[in-house]
């Protein structure tokens, strides 16, 4: 039975970043359900926008994005739509439009060969025994059993590691649904859509490489029905759909209290969305995935006597920032306050009257 210093479950942005940073410094094994290349197998449904905080992480690490990861077009504003109030506002944002699956595979490709990576693998069982973490996983057609001093859960919203460590922990979840359509709009755009009759979270649209992606986060019970209802409503705001080319869905976490951020225990650690590190106001998680990976790297290399306590302290600033996103989310999803903010025109950039796309309903009071 092979033994490692660190076993990482999941190679999204958080797991890939940590594996790369620990390579050559610790003996690391990493398991991931995505294939090593190509479009077959698992791919994460995601709008694919790289926020400024994530961009700063790449600057810090001296990395530049390859052209095959970057999507077309690059748009510098977000149309914010309040459906009930028939209001549309235009806010400047500095996102980078990316192909999320290509981005994830590129992040994995940066992991040095000294890390033992198993692609297209499935973690079957984890447990702690004799001060070691035991992991049974299936890869290359057969089951393997390894042990590790440290276990890292970088396995996202449905984290197996989080469920094992905190079996009674409850965090609000939504089903994220999105569909891809052939782009019909004369000018591509991003949008953020609020409709409290549909969801107390939000919906979105993104133009990407000739496609129009429309999605949102909805209650788990009847998410598909709510998604369909919102699509019908958006025709009043000049959204054009047609026949769906592809449909995707996944679970997304929605932290709503301080206790929703969990970092691990007993030499097991959680990073990225597995720890609840996702923005409640935008559902953006890549920047927090990269930041938490960097924090855990520093903890591992310092080898403190109480690693879990050190990681908890080191993530305090990150957790405070994310708690601020919870407060912001409550403001954005409060109909009266949101309507007041949008009516005030603060930070709104008006577009020319003859601009070819004005996403307002016929009853708009702009």
Curated annotation (Swiss-Prot):
PANTHER family: CONDITIONED MEDIUM FACTOR RECEPTOR 1, GERANYLGERANYL DIPHOSPHATE REDUCTASE. One of its GO terms (molecular function) is FAD binding. Belongs to the CbrA family. This is Protein CbrA. The lineage of its organism: Bacteria, Pseudomonadati, Pseudomonadota, Gammaproteobacteria, Enterobacterales. InterPro entries: FAD-bd (IPR002938), FAD/NAD-bd_sf (IPR036188), Geranylgeranyl_reductase (IPR050407). It comes from the Bacteria. It holds the Pfam family FAD_binding_3.
């Amino acid at each position: 039975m092979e033994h490692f210093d660190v076993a990482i479950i999941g190679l999204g942005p958080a797991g890939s970043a940590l594996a790369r940073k620990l390579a050559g410094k610790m003996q690391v094994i990493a398991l991931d359900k995505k294939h090593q290349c190509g479009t077959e197998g698992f791919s994460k449904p995601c709008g694919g926008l790289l926020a400024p905080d994530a961009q700063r992480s790449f600057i810090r690490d001296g990395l530049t994005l390859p052209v095959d990861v970057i999507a077309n077009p690059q748009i510098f504003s977000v149309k914010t739509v309040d459906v009930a109030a028939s209001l549309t506002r235009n806010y400047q944002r500095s996102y980078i439009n990316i192909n999320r699956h290509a981005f994830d595979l590129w992040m994995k490709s940066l992991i040095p060969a000294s890390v033992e990576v198993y692609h297209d693998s499935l973690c079957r069982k984890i447990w702690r025994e004799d001060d070691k973490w035991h992991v049974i996983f299936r890869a290359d057609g057969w089951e393997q059993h390894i042990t590790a001093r440290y276990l890292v859960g970088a396995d996202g919203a449905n984290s197996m590691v989080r469920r094992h460590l905190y079996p009674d922990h409850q965090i609000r979840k939504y089903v994220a649904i999105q569909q891809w359509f052939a782009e019909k709009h004369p000018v591509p755009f991003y949008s953020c859509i609020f409709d409290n009759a549909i969801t107390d979270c939000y919906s979105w649209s993104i133009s990407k490489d000739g496609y129009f992606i429309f999605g949102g986060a909805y209650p788990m019970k009847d998410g598909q029905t709510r998604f369909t209802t919102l699509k019908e409503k958006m025709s009043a705001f000049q959204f054009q759909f047609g026949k769906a080319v592809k449909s995707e869905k996944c679970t997304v976490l929605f932290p709503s209290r301080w206790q929703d951020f969990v970092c691990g225990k007993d030499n097991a650690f959680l990073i990225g969305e597995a720890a609840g590190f996702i923005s409640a106001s935008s559902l953006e998680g890549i920047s927090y995935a990269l930041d938490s990976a960097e924090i855990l790297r520093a903890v591992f290399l310092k080898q403190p006597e109480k690693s879990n306590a050190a990681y908890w302290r080191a993530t305090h600033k990150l957790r405070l920032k994310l708690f601020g996103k919870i407060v912001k989310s409550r403001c954005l999803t409060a109909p009266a306050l949101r309507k007041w903010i949008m009516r005030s025109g603060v930070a709104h950039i008006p577009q020319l009257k003859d601009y070819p796309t004005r996403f307002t309903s016929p009853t708009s009071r702009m």
